[in-house]
């Protein structure tokens, strides 16, 4: 196995004497922990995800950031006219990024989630983030929002609440999803006190606080074993994204092979 590959997968620093000690490749991801409890009527799943990217988590410098979730699953078989199958609550916080005045010092700068010093489009693929869609790329946000030219993700400091549910009402299946967020831009577009070392913070404008609501609703019905119909509606309202809505009518057919 090539030595460089071992350095990549372990995150160990590499130096051959001619170049400075660096980690090879990029190491972005999350550390997950979860607990599942199964009762007679409901199954409960609690989980927490922490970001890691530039090494701040090893110093507990961005331990405040992460995703907290609670999922409830109905374990009862029922013929009730109203039946919930799953319910989900999530809270996402990404404001810290090891850049708060009280954040423990680290060998690297703040995390600046999904942005990159060399890749103009950061950690994205075909214009979309490789992680949570709540961290906003430049092309999705309103054009009048302040942004630093080095940031492809112009909003990565946020507090968001998400709710989801699916079940049935009078024989019709339903899916509901809604996210509400307060968005604070990046450390380059804030006037908040910080320990990031950024020298031009606020030079390209102040992002302030932008609030956003995004919602999705689906009502579906199986007409028989093969044919299904669904009505779908989606809505964006707020000051981060442009206001928009859409209505869809979906028909599906399942083949038995």
Where do the PLM segments sit?
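Acidic/polar loop-and-plug regions of large Gram-negative outer-membrane beta-barrel proteins
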Residues: 1-20
């Amino acid at each position: 196995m090539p030595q460089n590959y071992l350095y990549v997968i372990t995150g160990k620093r590499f130096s051959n004497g001619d170049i400075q000690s660096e980690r090879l490749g990029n190491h972005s991801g999350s550390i997950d922990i979860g607990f599942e409890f199964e009762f007679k009527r409901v199954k409960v799943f609690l989980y927490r995800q922490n970001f890691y990217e530039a090494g701040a988590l090893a110093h507990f410098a961005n331990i405040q950031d992460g995703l907290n979730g609670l999922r409830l699953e109905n374990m009862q078989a029922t013929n009730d006219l109203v039946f919930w199958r799953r319910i989900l609550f999530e809270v996402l916080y990404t404001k810290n990024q090891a850049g708060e005045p009280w954040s423990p010092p680290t060998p690297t700068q703040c995390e600046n989630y999904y942005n990159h010093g060399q890749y103009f489009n950061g950690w994205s693929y075909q214009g979309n983030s490789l992680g949570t869609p709540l961290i906003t790329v430049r092309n999705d946000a309103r054009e009048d929002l302040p942004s630093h030219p080095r940031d492809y993700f112009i909003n990565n400091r946020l507090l968001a609440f998400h709710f989801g549910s699916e079940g049935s009402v009078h024989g019709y299946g339903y899916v509901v999803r809604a996210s509400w967020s307060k968005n604070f831009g990046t450390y380059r577009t804030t006037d908040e006190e910080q320990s990031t070392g950024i020298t031009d913070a606020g030079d390209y404008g102040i992002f302030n606080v932008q609030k956003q609501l995004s919602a999705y609703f689906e009502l579906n019905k199986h007409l028989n074993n093969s044919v299904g119909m669904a009505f779908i509606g989606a809505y964006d309202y707020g000051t981060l994204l442009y206001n928009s809505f859409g209505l869809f009518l979906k028909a599906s057919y399942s083949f038995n092979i």
